[in-house]
Amino acid sequence: MLRLGIAACALVALALAEGFTFTIGSPVASQDFQAKGASFVFRTEGCADPAKSQISATAEGLLKGERKSLTLQVMAMPKPGIYAVFLGWPAEGDWIVNLKGTCADAKAGALVPIGPKGFIREASKFFPRPATDAEIETSLKALRQRGKK
């Protein structure tokens, strides 16, 4: 009986860990005035204790032909699991926000392209791990191609 209980708890933990991911939205989606000037907001999903999530973000881009990586500040909103990303990169150039997160043993990642009018939801990519350098480069290339059309 004890083994069955331990196995059930392990399966629940595994199911939650495998489902850890991000969902992005406009600042209005946070329903918090603190996010009003944000570039976008995101929510963690599949984390049993969202307040204990560890989140980081970088702006990955090309500026005047030179590759840049800038650390961004991620602001936690009052509601656990909701975060805002504010503009922390130059207006010129091609930029993608690289989100990384952990919740217990689970990891999540996302690449959020930034266009002239803000984040591009339909071109965003989500991963069950941090994005690789190759995925970042591919997304930057796609963003450049999108801008030339």
Which sequence ranges carry the predicted segments?
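Sec-dependent signal peptide recognition
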Residues: 1-8
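N-terminal soluble domains immediately following signal/targeting peptides that reside
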Residues: 18-149
